């Protein structure tokens, strides 16, 4: 349970997703062996009277839900709506993708846009996963985000999960929106390049 291994796991997960593979499931086959035990230990410690900030482990199964998709697929979804005037086909796709995205079901965005194998979006996708993952781990380690001791369903909307899983951590909800804002900034120039290329393609190659 350390920030360097966690950040590496987030990087590898994003890299696998870009290649069309389920990065969470693949890396989780190794890490879940540890993180499931760690959240159980956190729960045991909490029930014994340990304060949330003093729980033994930062890295728990759902820690990534506070960063990875809210900093990548949520910004992509927003930009899909924003670009729908220039690229009309994006609006119905974004509308379909919105309800599942609220519950961290991101396959419609990953394979529908697609983000997978997308040369314009692969760099910010990997970057946001990695940076916000490390940032969230650090904020949890210093106590801004409460350490999780309840293993809620993975599809719980991220702000709610961050708040409830640590027994009412306001920081756990706030960090979701911070990571979303970070993702919006990182994705912006890459999305504009993607939008320009798609408009040119739609216009038959004209600039």
PLM segments and residue spans:
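Flexible hinge motifs at transmembrane-helix junctions and intramembrane kinks/re-entrant loops
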Residues: 1, 17-28, 190-205
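Helix-loop-helix junctions within the multi-pass membrane cores of secondary transporters/permeases
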Residues: 38-121, 125, 129
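Hydrophobic alpha-helical segments of membrane proteins
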Residues: 7, 11, 19, 26-29, ...
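Hydrophobic alpha-helical transmembrane segments
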Residues: 2-25, 51-72, 162-185
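Helix-loop-helix
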Residues: 4, 31-38, 184, 188-195
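Transmembrane alpha-helix interface/packing and boundary motifs in multi-pass membrane proteins
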Residues: 11-24, 33-36, 100-103, 108
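Pore- and pathway-forming membrane helices of multi-pass small-molecule/ion transporters and channels
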Residues: 29-38, 69-76, 97-103, 144-165
């Amino acid at each position: 349970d350390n920030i360097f291994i966690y950040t590496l796991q987030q990087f590898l997960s994003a890299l696998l997703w870009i290649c069309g593979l389920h990065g969470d499931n693949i890396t989780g086959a190794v890490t879940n062996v540890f993180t499931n035990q760690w959240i159980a230990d956190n729960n045991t410690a909490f029930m014994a009277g340990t304060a949330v900030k003093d729980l033994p482990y930062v890295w728990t199964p759902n820690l990534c839900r506070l960063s990875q998709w809210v900093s990548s697929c949520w910004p992509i979804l927003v930009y899909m709506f924003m670009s729908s005037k220039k690229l009309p086909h994006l609006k119905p796709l974004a509308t379909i993708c919105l309800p599942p995205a609220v519950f961290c079901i991101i396959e419609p965005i990953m394979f529908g846009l697609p983000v997978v194998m997308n040369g314009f979006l692969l760099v910010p996708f990997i970057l946001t996963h990695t940076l916000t993952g490390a940032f969230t781990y650090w904020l949890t380690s210093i106590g801004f985000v409460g350490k999780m001791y309840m293993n809620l369903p993975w599809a719980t909307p991220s702000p709610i999960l961050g708040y409830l899983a640590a027994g009412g951590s306001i920081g756990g909800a706030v960090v979701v929106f911070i990571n979303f804002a970070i993702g919006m900034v990182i994705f912006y120039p890459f999305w504009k390049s993607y939008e320009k290329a798609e408009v040119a393609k739609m216009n038959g190659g004209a600039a």
